[in-house]
Amino acid sequence: MFSKILIANRGEIACRIQRSCRRLGIATVAVYSDADARAQHVRGADEGRWIGASPPAESYLRAERILAAALDSGAEAVHPGFGFLSENADFAEAVEQAGLKFIGPSAASMRKMGSKAGAKILMSAAGVPVVPGYTGEDQDPDLLMREAERVGFPLMIKAAHGGGGKGMRVVRSAGEFAASLQSCQREARGAFGRDRVLLERYVERPRHIEFQIFGDSSGAVIHLNERECSAQRRYQKVLEESPSPFVDARLREAMGAAAVLAGRSIDYRNAGTVEFIVGPAGDFYFMEINTRIQVEHPVTEMVTGLDLVELQLRVAAGELLADLVPTQPVPTRGHAIEVRLYAEDPDNQFLPGSGRLEMLRLPTTSASVRLDGGVVEGDQVTVHYDPMIAKLIVHGPDRVAALAELERALAATIVVGPKSNVEFLERLIRHASIVEASIDTGFLDRELGQILITPPPVPEAVLAAVAVRALLDEEANAAILARAQRDPHSPWGRADGWRLGHPGKRLKSFAHREQLLEFAAHAKVLSTEIERVIAAAAVRGTFQ
């Protein structure tokens, strides 16, 4: 096993890797930019190395600086995390050529997956299911009609040199094909100057289901079951879970075998994820292999009990999967769900936020609640990097229990400072499609307007009542303390806001829906008046 590694990343994933290393007795070296000089991943490492200015292009994407830091620190290996250089074959190759271990797949495997079109050709040749289609140069209309019938309907006609949604038509029957082909070719010719088209089976309302795989130096490849990531917004994952509520034992066996076959076909080593698109009838097709650890890996850890980062480290150090994970298929327990807490504004097209985290209250962790974060209260969310605050992962004996645990955990989460998506996530997990698991990759985009409906404001009388309750509790606690003092009648032992020469005044603050609400309680004769300090319209009330 390694004695020291460098983590070529920042934020949440760097902190996550450090936790496994700390438990295994491995020293860690952090790299940091100007903006991250006091970041959590730097404070949590055994040592740190500055690698450049704040923009990623001047720091976390500077492979030569990161490699120099690794060599200078005496690290034996480099863990790339996810994002940045994690899937850069040249970086992986440079690390190995420098005499260090790259904690991930080989550069050769990465290059084979670098082209999505090339990857599909390779997978098809290996026997992994890919979406049927036609990509040939021959554009004779009669040939295209025959190919369409071979591919099957519904299918999609796509401009070969297009993009941006132009030159695309969904065709649901043979009778529609000729007219749709002509229309698509005209649009492609006008938009791109070329009218060549491709044909591809159209999978309606698909699910995104992926399999976690691992390979080792002996050539062994295994899978650790599936995760479902169908709740997406513009192809960005929002909620991930394991096991998939859609996958039964038969489908799991078939997809798992295909995932292992995909890994073996490119001599895969270390952690990877084989992504599939799955139709409503259970037909599944290869999409791509992510050649790194995934953001959503904790849901697999929660249901298998395995530490995937530890597995990465041990496999990179030469240990074999047969010894590390002897039981196949890997047994799972219960249900896990992950959501990502972001500094972003869902009501403003999910615009990323930045600024100081004035207040950050996260749920208490337990066997059923896990938090993977890279910031704490008082830290800055900068404009330079992904605005993730934390990943919230929950576990329950079944999906219903896990959703209930997630609802409780989100209710206990408070973010004051930059806008966050906490309230959006609370509404999302209560949506009928999520509760019933009747989702597909387009669900969230279709239903976004409904989920973004802002709930009615809390009535002013309720806010005033909350303030009254807090004041009464404060007075009751003060009375208990006063009785314990030598002089129970001392004005210093009373919580009535008494001030010499001025009316009594007490301030109370509450966090609600990412707002800091402040109330002032003014002492009157035999009563107290409560005023909302920062409201546009004051909330007023009195109590005797």
Segments the model singles out, each with a brief description of its role:
Residues M1-V274, V278-H297:
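N-terminal beta-alpha lobe that positions the nucleotide/phosphoryl donor
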Residues A259, P298-F543:
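Catalytic cores of soluble metabolic enzymes centered on carboxylation/carboxyl-transfer
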